[in-house]
């Protein structure tokens, strides 16, 4: 038996889609509203009678834990209102929750991004399933699931896929949200000045706002405090730091990321950012080798880093070096990627 626990506020545009996709897959729905002024509560009551109000106190973990406390089941699944279940393997979930409760379950979340090359997907594995006897939420913002009483625990992937339908809107149009996140994270850091995760999240917030100098400072603070490479956020911290240095044109400084090679040598996203760093340092041979290595990975977080984005950048390198035929071969391997199609048109090969 498992309960879905959600915290919501002014989510009338998203909540119905989320709940109708999950209602027949779980045993209980618990919804905590933190101050909606729209029809969110009305929509929630169509799907469950366990709808509660929580006075907002600038603490996401407090709201999450309040929702968990009101669940009748020990096993908890957490979703946000702008997430909709795309695939749900009930058999895999049942098998997971019938094991030892001292484990976290990670689900796959697919976000849609948009840049100059068009839309692409960002895939994350995020811990969202836990037993409330052994775990709780911690952190006023970007809250994390943490063990109670320092129990030893495992992290396992559960075969559930969720589409985050609000990601693009969040990133592009959420200046108010970014400002709120900055304020809460800075407040949290004052209380926990040696928490590398908080510096990482503040760095991500500045990165989202394209304030790369402040992003760099906070990513460096996180790394200086020491990051266990087994932490879920460690890889993204290192890769985001790499992209920050590229945006700041600090290409030589970015070569310092080579020291993480041993930990992430088979990760497409890490190899991709390293390839970009080599490319911007005019080390084209190493860059091509890294891009080619990206294509050997079966999985990636950012869509295309193990396929068409790698081929596109190899094509750019060959074109710059005067090897037009090789460039064309790699551009054509990109299929319908718009930037590659543009290069083929300019080379009169389309």
Predicted features by range, described:
Residues 21, 33-42, 56, 80-83:
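A conserved acidic beta->alpha catalytic loop
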Residues 5-25:
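Short, well-formed alpha-helical segments that are part of the catalytic scaffolds
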Residues 76:
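Short aromatic/hydrophobic "clamp" motif used to bind/position activated sugar donors
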Residues 62-68, 79, 85-210, 214-217:
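Catalytic-site signature of metal-activated, phosphate-bearing donor transferases
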Residues 27, 42-66, 70:
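Conserved donor nucleotide-binding strand/loop of the catalytic core
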Residues 16, 38-47, 88-89:
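Acidic helix N-cap motif at the loop->helix transition within catalytic regions
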């Amino acid at each position: 038996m498992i309960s879905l626990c959600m915290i919501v506020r002014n989510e009338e545009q998203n909540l119905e889609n989320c709940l109708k996709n999950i209602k027949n897959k779980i045993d209980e729905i618990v919804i905590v509203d933190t101050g909606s002024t729209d029809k969110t509560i009305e929509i929630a009551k169509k799907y469950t009678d366990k709808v509660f109000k929580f006075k907002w106190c600038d603490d996401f973990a407090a709201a999450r834990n309040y929702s968990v406390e009101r669940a009748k089941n020990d096993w908890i699944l957490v979703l946000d209102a702008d997430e909709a279940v795309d695939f749900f393997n009930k058999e895999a979930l049942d098998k997971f929750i019938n094991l030892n409760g001292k484990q976290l379950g990670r689900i796959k979340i697919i976000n849609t991004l948009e840049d100059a090359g068009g839309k692409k997907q960002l895939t994350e594995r995020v811990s969202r399933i836990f037993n409330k006897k052994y775990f709780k939420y911690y952190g006023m913002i970007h809250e994390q699931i943490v063990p109670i009483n320092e129990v030893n625990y495992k992290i396992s992937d559960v075969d559930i896929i969720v589409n985050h339908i609000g990601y693009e809107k969040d990133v592009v149009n959420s200046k108010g949200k970014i400002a709120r996140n900055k304020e809460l994270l800075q407040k949290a850091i004052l209380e926990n000045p040696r928490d590398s995760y908080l510096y990482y999240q503040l760095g991500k917030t500045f990165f989202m706002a394209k304030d790369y100098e402040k992003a760099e400072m906070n990513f460096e603070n996180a790394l200086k405090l020491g990051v266990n490479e087994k932490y879920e956020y460690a890889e993204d911290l290192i890769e985001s730091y790499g992209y920050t240095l590229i945006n700041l044109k600090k290409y030589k400084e970015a070569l310092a990321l080579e020291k993480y090679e041993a930990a992430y040598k088979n990760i497409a996203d890490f190899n991709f950012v390293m390839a970009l760093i080599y490319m911007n340092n005019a080390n084209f041979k190493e860059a091509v080798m890294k891009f080619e290595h990206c294509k050997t990975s079966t999985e990636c977080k950012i869509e295309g880093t193990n396929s068409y984005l790698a081929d596109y950048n190899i094509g750019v390198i060959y074109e710059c070096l005067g090897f037009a035929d090789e460039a064309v071969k790699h551009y054509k391997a990109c299929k319908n990627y718009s930037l590659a199609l543009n290069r083929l048109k300019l080379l009169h090969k389309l």
